[in-house]
Amino acid sequence: MSVISILPLASKSCLYKSLMSSTHELKALCRPIATLGMCRRGKSVMASKSTSLTTAVSDDGVQRRIGDHHSNLWDDNFIQSLSSPYGASSYGERAERLIGEVKEIFNSLSRTDGELVSHVDDLLQHLSMVDNVERLGIDRHFQTEIKVSLDYVYSYWSEKGIGSGRDIVCTDLNTTALGFRILRLHGYTVFPDVFEHFKDQMGRIACSDNHTERQISSILNLFRASLIAFPGEKVMEEAEIFSATYLKEALQTIPVSSLSQEIQYVLQYRWHSNLPRLEARTYIDILQENTKNQMLDVNTKKVLELAKLEFNIFHSLQQNELKSVSRWWKESGFPDLNFIRHRHVEFYTLVSGIDMEPKHCTFRLSFVKMCHLITVLDDMYDTFGTIDELRLFTAAVKRWDPSTTECLPEYMKGVYTVLYETVNEMAQEAQKSQGRDTLSYVRQALEAYIGAYHKEAEWISSGYLPTFDEYFENGKVSSGHRIATLQPTFMLDIPFPHHVLQEIDFPSKFNDFACSILRLRGDTRCYQADRARGEEASCISCYMKDNPGSTQEDALNHINNMIEETIKKLNWELLKPDNNVPISSKKHAFDINRGLHHFYNYRDGYTVASNETKNLVIKTVLEPVPM
């Protein structure tokens, strides 16, 4: 049960060839498929259909389970017709000029005509500037300037925090909370005890009962800071509970405004399920509203102008990449397999939502292809394939030799061929950036993944319900996080020598925690639909088995607590001081986890493309922002 459910092929995919190479093979394939209503021709049979499962018996006596998934929502002709004017060189030239102007704004924060800016709020100005460019998704242009600003702020950091300016003796909560979050995310050593100095005699964060905009902003920054917690930081737990409660109450009393929109977004997506591109789009809209109300200064307007232009330039690139993805999907022959979910557009939305660097095209495309392959395998192992067929396929993946697949059913031959060719092609491309062969790493991860799938298929076939620990250890592998992350990561222009892989891949704590979060969160969103498809084993059902008398609510509470603690552990693995593995080497794997978590924030956003998922595709991929 996968929670996830690079190069374009030069010609029609081998799956299509496998389907159409001979009349005999076509009939052999259509016998089971046509009887299940998945081909336009063939015999019909009696079928029983539940809310999310169709079972049918073919005329050769084979009974198969099929998830009742909705079809692809995004027409290929529509995707191929997309166009954008923002790919023109004139827009890129305008962006370069604006980048230079924003760099000058950064520099002016330190000096203006040889004099330092106001000592009253210079620290807050530095932090706000960094916060703005990061939330707007344009920080990649200003890494040097950000480092200078944060070094400056950190030089005034104390155990009691900081004030708004270098000469302000009294520390304030707003600047301290904003500084804590940004400094911690950039690898500076800061401790949460700093927030103890903002408590009253009752041990609570000191604030008035009046919901002033200044106070709300301070508590909002405290909430954002509390989400970057490490294990055992009780102060951060208390800050999160207090600030979340305060902000929810504030929403009931303040009018609808840019501030209320910001609060709603942060409460909804927090940090670990936040997509950077969605945040950029949301923050652009918020600042645009402030512009209409004449609430922005000249510098922020300049930053906003660059953010909108950059958003739309990348939007033009997204359309071209999405066309490539859609062509690959169509040529692969997967649209002819109607028992699988077709979610390539959603996968692309996810990956382009976490990586907006134009040069990382192969990373994005390989992620989409790997995730779609995972989804095909998931649907094949969970529902359509018989246990005997799956045993043959599992053995074939271990052999990794397409010449030895004659024993497979025709539909499996096609799936195997696309899997084999796509993985090998991506490994060849990865060799260019890594300078070595990475196929052995990916094959090992793929074999482990298929093995975990196979074990779950055996459980389904035999009706076995494992213990929680047995299910969870296997489920971390079958979540698909590792295999979805590993191959695309090799496509980056970042070297991943063996000692770095040991820190982010199996069996590292980083990999274990990332897989754990995805398995746990996925099960809380999917367990009811999985049970309807005949998949009894889940974290919920296995917990209840181990704890007789417990309810689903008990199980969900236990698992949600596990998720919260594991997120803190993953935060630590990302941000802990480590000279051997810089944050940049871990960041893409971490952000993939955030993106996948986003799609399971409230529901299974893959299997069922809700209005929220559709709106995400529209807002972050299909539509530009108004200039």
UniProtKB/Swiss-Prot annotation:
Read off the Pfam families from this record.
Terpene_synth, Terpene_synth_C
Can you cite an annotated GO cellular component?
Answer: chloroplast
Triggers of expression? By jasmonic acid (MeJA).
Pathway per its UniProt entry is: Terpene metabolism; oleoresin biosynthesis
Entry GO MF terms: lyase activity; magnesium ion binding; terpene synthase activity
- Transit peptide residues are 1-36
Q: Where, by residue number, does Mg(2+) 2 bind?
A: 378, 382
Q: Main location per UniProt?
A: plastid
Q: Would the keyword Manganese turn up in this protein's UniProt record?
A: yes
Which CDD domains does the record cross-reference, listed alphabetically?
Terpene_cyclase_plant_C1 (cd00684)
Enzyme Commission number, as recorded = 4.2.3.107
Q: Which GO terms describe its biological process?
A: cellular response to jasmonic acid stimulus; diterpenoid biosynthetic process; monoterpene biosynthetic process
The reactions it catalyses are: (2E)-geranyl diphosphate = (+)-car-3-ene + diphosphate
Looking up Gene3D superfamilies in the UniProt record yields: Farnesyl Diphosphate Synthase, Terpene synthase, N-terminal domain
- Residues annotated for Mg(2+) 3 binding in this entry: 530
User: Which InterPro entries does the entry mention?
Assistant: Isoprenoid_synthase_dom_sf, Terpene_cyclase-like_1_C, Terpene_cyclase_plant_C1, Terpene_synth_N, Terpene_synth_N_sf, Terpene_synthase-like, Terpene_synthase_metal-bd, Terpenoid_cyclase/PrenylTrfase
Chain ranges for the short sequence motif DDXXD motif as given in the UniProt record: 378-382
Which keywords does the record carry?
A: Chloroplast, Lyase, Magnesium, Manganese, Metal-binding, Plastid, Transit peptide
Q: What is the purpose of this protein?
A: Terpene synthase (TPS) involved in defensive oleoresin formation in conifers in response to insect attack or other injury.
Q: Specify the protein name.
A: Carene synthase, chloroplastic
Record the organism.
Answer: Picea abies
